[in-house]
Amino acid sequence: MTVQGKKITVHDMTLRDGMHPKRHLMTLEQMKNIATGLDEAGVPLIEVTHGDGLGGSSVNYGFPAHSDEEYLGAVIPLMKQAKISALLLPGIGTVEHLHMAKDLGVHTIRVATHCTEADVSEQHITAARKLDMDTVGFLMMAHMASPEKLITQAKLMEGYGANCIYVTDSAGYMLPGDVKLRLEAVRAALRPETELGFHGHHNLAMGVANSVAAVEAGANRIDAAAAGLGAGAGNTPMEVFIAVCDRMGIETGVDVFKIQDVAEDRVVPIMDHIIRVDRDSLTLGYAGVYSSFLLFAKRAEKKYGVSARDILVEMGRRKMVGGQEDMIEDTAITMARERAGCAAA
């Protein structure tokens, strides 16, 4: 597909996926500062919630510094042109959370499921459409499903009322060819008016290349984060993606230099650690492991003396998926016991 002159919607993840490396402890001032910068740079859609979506505050996923209501209530009134989205994972977020988000002024709701479990999204997608919200079906860990399986799941979400379907590389595992294969298949199967999106992670440093491949395959919504702030090695770094789009003639409406300044001056200073491809985040991509598992594995490493890399490789071997964070500690305990037993023998 020729991309010269193609218009796409860039969707910011800094204030949602970026909550993972911040351990969900972003302050209201940090959130407002970054959101206003993104708005001024021309980013049209910004996601704001706990890293695991509406209702994510829990022992399993982590307690945030503020509630979803407080974050959304602080950011939405400040926006001059950008719309705000929220993520919702059925089983974590509820229809009540959906109504709360709508009442606060959230424009877009993204209902996320594992790539083979779209059927659990029906209630939430149907409710969002009844509220006349921009409603997105978000298929996570898409590398684990064949194009044919993704088509089946995407069409379920479309049938429930989703006006946009996302193919999501939650593990940062896919290469550009994998992205094209899946998105071209899904694009061909959906109704022409149904939009197509791609969400990438940078664990194999493929975030930008994969996002370009997605646009070439027919996607018109692309997720990215300023300075890549997100789980694992981060999301597709927005400032790089915007520059590449500008070079290629893809129209984003985002100012090339203003988004660089947001990344450099507003996002990098709040990082608890530099978001980069290190051995553990690289392992996420190599082994096909859910990106938000990274900090859980690092904590287990300190607690049980088993390397985070070994834990992540084992999680990949077991094909664990998002929502099974509790299994990280269980896996680390098992591995530590096995090694202690071998040492004793």
From Swiss-Prot:
Residues that bind Mn(2+): D17, H199, H201
Domain of life of the organism encoding this protein: Bacteria
PROSITE patterns: PYR_CT
Disulphide bond pairs: none
Site positions for Transition state stabilizer: R16
Broad class of enzyme this protein falls into: lyase
EC number of this enzyme: 4.1.3.39
Reaction(s) catalysed by this chain's protein: (S)-4-hydroxy-2-oxopentanoate = acetaldehyde + pyruvate
Keyword check for Transit peptide: no
Gene Ontology molecular functions: 2-isopropylmalate synthase activity; 4-hydroxy-2-oxovalerate aldolase activity; manganese ion binding
InterPro entries: 2-IPM_HCS-like, 4OH_2_O-val_aldolase, Aldolase_TIM, DmpG_comm, DRE_TIM_HOA, PYR_CT
Keyword set, alphabetical order: Aromatic hydrocarbons catabolism, Lyase, Manganese, Metal-binding
Listed Pfam families: DmpG_comm, HMGL-like
Residues annotated as catalytic: H20
Residues annotated as binding substrate: R16, D17, S170, H199, Y290
Biological process per Gene Ontology, one example term: catabolic process
The Pyruvate carboxyltransferase domain, residue ranges: 8-260
Similarity comment: family membership: Belongs to the 4-hydroxy-2-oxovalerate aldolase family.
Protein name (Swiss-Prot/TrEMBL): 4-hydroxy-2-oxovalerate aldolase
